């Protein structure tokens, strides 16, 4: 292992990819040695001296540890763009979040953030629709969107699934999606479910005068089957597909993004399984990195947490994810381990707040996120005492109250669906 990777005076070039890591050296290893091994293992080096690594090549491609704070257990490393296949998320992660997570020389390593250079951003298309395109697709410009997940998660047959979706639509939902673990099971086949639900979505549009979007899950065993399912939806007249981004894998997601553009379909990203490597604050990969990769690849909307619901995520973490979704230029924030990122005009993603939400939480959601959020409810709609239609209606009523600055209690006086929801979910 070379010893010249510590380069505190180095100023990253515009073409460098920069990463921030949290590192905890194992007992008996000093901080600088751990940082050196991390930088080398994630780029050009190995555990011992390599005869095939010429001085010229090493000087050209070596990483630069330009920031090291032992007290904060933080290092920043600048990598030459030549180390990467610029349009490949799997290759980038294999380098900066690959073997380094398994090294014995450190007890914990966490990739906190990646700042992508212009050359890499230019290799990606970003979202095809993005936030503005989704608003145009749905025909709603001035309020949050209301969505739901068909519940129960699994077990309904295709006919019942479509009926629950229809009731959600006529009650006021803009979007209805499959649950993340529903794909093509025997009790509810993908093709039959898609046909029936899209037909009832069209019926709900004609009855309500609003656009209604069904987000059918195309996550599949192979990329070939995933694309076949996507094209099946396209032929049925769908506008959307959803995909479980972590179980599917980054190669599958990049493939889907390319094919979805040709098909003219928007992409909804469900982040299930992300906590396997994002939740531990000392080891793995941050959700911030996952969100940035999603925008880079070009997903149109992404689950980011709720602050007020059942999912893990502090308010500042969720809002940092929101910023990476919607801002064109994200400023650096050392206290939050955020590197400056210029998205260079890539379209913003639509943030999705989902997980343990009820209509009573809508004022808080609106206060936290503003209008540019998709508020997505599961049990908060389908557990309404008056049924799914009333549950969706209660959500729209709560949103209308929030937009007008009226308390839910006052608005509920003339809206029985909301009044019933308050009786069930409002904390006494």
From Swiss-Prot:
An annotated GO BP: AMP catabolic process
Gene3D superfamilies in the cross-refs: Ribulose bisphosphate carboxylase, large subunit, C-terminal domain, RuBisCO large subunit, N-terminal domain
N6-carboxylysine, modified sites: 177
Catalyzed chemical reaction(s): 2 (2R)-3-phosphoglycerate + 2 H(+) = D-ribulose 1,5-bisphosphate + CO2 + H2O; D-ribulose 1,5-bisphosphate + O2 = 2-phosphoglycolate + (2R)-3-phosphoglycerate + 2 H(+)
Cofactor note: Binds 1 Mg(2+) ion per subunit.
Oxidoreductase in keyword set: yes
Record has Lyase as a keyword: yes
EC primary class: lyase
InterPro entries in UniProt: RuBisCO (IPR033966), RuBisCO_III (IPR017712), RuBisCO_lsu_C (IPR000685), RuBisCO_lsu_C_sf (IPR036376), RuBisCO_lsu_fd_N (IPR017443), RuBisCO_lsu_N_sf (IPR036422)
Domain of life: Archaea
Keyword annotations: Carbon dioxide fixation, Lyase, Magnesium, Metal-binding, Oxidoreductase
Enzyme Commission number(s): 4.1.1.39
Active-site residues annotated for this sequence: 151, 270
Binding site residues for Mg(2+): 177, 179-180
Cofactor(s) the protein requires to work: Mg(2+)
Annotated site (Transition state stabilizer): 310
Pfam families listed in its UniProt record: RuBisCO_large, RuBisCO_large_N
Binding site for substrate: 153, 271, 303, 354-356, 376-379
GO terms of molecular function: magnesium ion binding; oxidoreductase activity; ribulose-bisphosphate carboxylase activity
Family of this protein: Belongs to the RuBisCO large chain family. Type III subfamily.
Additional information: Because the Archaea possessing a type III RuBisCO are all anaerobic, it is most likely that only the carboxylase activity of RuBisCO, and not the competitive oxygenase activity (by which RuBP reacts with O(2) to form one molecule of 3-phosphoglycerate and one molecule of 2-phosphoglycolate), is biologically relevant in these strains.
Its job: Catalyzes the addition of molecular CO(2) and H(2)O to ribulose 1,5-bisphosphate (RuBP), generating two molecules of 3-phosphoglycerate (3-PGA). Functions in an archaeal AMP degradation pathway, together with AMP phosphorylase and R15P isomerase.
Name of protein: Ribulose bisphosphate carboxylase
């Amino acid at each position: 292992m070379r010893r010249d990777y510590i380069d505190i005076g180095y100023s990253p070039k515009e073409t460098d990819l920069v990463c921030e890591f949290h590192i905890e050296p194992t007992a008996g290893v000093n901080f600088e040695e751990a940082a050196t091994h991390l930088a080398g293992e994630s780029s050009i080096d190995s555990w011992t001296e390599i005869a095939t690594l010429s001085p010229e090549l090493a000087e050209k491609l070596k990483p630069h540890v330009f920031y090291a704070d032992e007290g904060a257990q933080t290092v920043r490393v600048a990598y030459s763009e030549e180390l990467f296949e610029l349009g490949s998320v799997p290759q980038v992660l294999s380098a900066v979040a690959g073997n380094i997570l398994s090294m014995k020389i450190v007890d914990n390593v966490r990739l906190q953030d990646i700042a992508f250079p212009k050359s890499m951003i230019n290799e990606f298309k970003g979202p095809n629709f993005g936030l503005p395109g989704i608003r145009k697709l749905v025909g709603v410009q001035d309020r949050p969107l209301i969505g739901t997940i068909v519940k129960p998660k699994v077990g309904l047959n295709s006919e019942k699934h479509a009926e629950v979706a229809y009731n959600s639509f006529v009650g006021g939902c803009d979007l209805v999606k499959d649950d993340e673990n529903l794909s093509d099971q025997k009790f509810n086949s993908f093709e039959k479910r898609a046909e029936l639900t899209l037909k009832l979505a069209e019926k709900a549009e004609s009855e309500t005068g609003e656009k209604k979007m069904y987000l059918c899950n195309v996550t599949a065993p192979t990329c070939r089957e995933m694309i076949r399912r996507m094209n099946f939806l396209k032929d049925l007249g769908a506008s959307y597909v959803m995909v479980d981004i972590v179980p599917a894998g980054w190669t599958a997601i990049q493939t889907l993004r390319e094919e979805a553009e040709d098909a003219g379909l928007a992409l909804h990203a469900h982040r299930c399984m992300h906590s396997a490597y994002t939740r531990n604050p000392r080891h793995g990969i941050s959700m911030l990195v996952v969100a940035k990769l999603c925008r880079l690849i070009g997903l149109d909307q992404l689950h980011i947490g709720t602050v007020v619901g059942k999912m893990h995520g502090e308010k500042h973490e969720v809002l940092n994810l929101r910023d990476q979704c919607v801002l064109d230029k994200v400023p650096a924030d050392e206290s939050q381990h955020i590197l400056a990122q210029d998205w260079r005009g890539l379209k913003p993603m639509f943030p999705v707040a989902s997980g343990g939400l009820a209509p009573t939480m809508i004022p808080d959601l609106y206060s936290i996120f503003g209008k540019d959020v998709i508020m997505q409810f599961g049990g908060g709609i389908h557990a309404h005492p008056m049924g799914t239609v009333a549950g969706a209606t209660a959500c729209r009523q709560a949103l209308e109250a929030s937009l007008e600055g009226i308390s839910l209690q006052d608005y509920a006086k003339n809206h029985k669906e909301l009044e019933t929801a308050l009786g069930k979910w409002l904390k006494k």
